[in-house]
Amino acid sequence: MTSKHPLLNRNLVLLIICQGLFLTNNVTFIAINGLVGLSLAPVSWMATLPVMGYVVGGAFSTSIVAKSQNYFGRKISFQLGLLVAMLSALLCAYAAVSKNFWLLVMGTFIAGYYSANGQLYRFAAAELTDLKQRDKAVSWVLAGGILGAVIGPNLASWTRDLFDTAFLGAYLTLSIAGFIGIFVMQFIHFPQELKTQHSLSDGRPLSVILRQPVFVVAIIGAALGYGVMNLLMAATPLAMQICGLPFSDTALVLEWHVIGMFAPGFFTGSLIQRFGTLKIMGVGVLLNFICIAIALTGTNLHQFFIALFLLGVGWNFLFTGATSLAMTAYQPNERDKAQAAINFFVFGTMAFTSFGSGALVTSHGWSILNWGSLIPVAITGLALYWLAQQRKNSQAPT
């Protein structure tokens, strides 16, 4: 491993590319699955079930992926995920052509296996550099999502009318992206694979790991931070269509939202090292509050644009910070089960918010959705304050 700047690490650069391809898949799915679902669903409130299928599939896959990572190692497990990405994209394409709503939901559910793998890229990044650079490595790999920010929404927009079936071209292109990912992953060397693999029963029981205050707050920050972001992002294409805004505007808003999610990755790691994890996560909570306040002022393009951009930056600070917190709470031989637990809570929260976003925005409107988002944001802020007080009390002289 190297002590140089993370970007100069060849393995890390290749993993950043894979992260970009992963987010291209995610952003494209968010941009089109709700709209394709709306055109195929028996009733409008079911429009985001394909989006929900993606995250529920991820939740169901977390334990399978943990066992796969432990048995096969990082590289092969990640490549299996990319293979599933190819096949599931083709299944979604067939569902769109055959106008089969439930087949579309099944396709996105299967694609969740890829998502469960991709969510581990950030943890794998920490293994590709030394301990002092770990926060920066995680931050830089998350920054690779900028590739998805640029390609995803534009891919959806450019390929929307490429065939008679709307967005068929996007699904077919995602299958090609999966193949490219398999090829790139082949050239990444994961040092962890050289070590003796551990059983998932090694180390402390998961119940002990889960009871640590730092791990509890890491889960809350990651799960609720992702949940609020997903709640508002998944609803945005539907909300903008209901408000009469063209899809080109939706693509623009999503592009800059995802740029907001990942562009800070170039410096979030440095900010964490300088100011501390909890303070940066606290800024993320504040940005979420500001996002909601702006979203509640109206439904014009500039309000969607600014709110979603700030939502993205807030998510970055919360999610990067939560990842850094989590890595202080487990030992190397506890890695797979601890990471699987975090991702299970993340996917579970995303599943709930994916369904809730479609149901709320189509039945109660954009404003009610934003008012409801205040609750998890407030809970996250209180959790950060609680952990800060725990640390302050433990350092107090006795």
State what each model feature region is:
Residues 330-366:
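A late C-terminal transmembrane helix in Major Facilitator Superfamily
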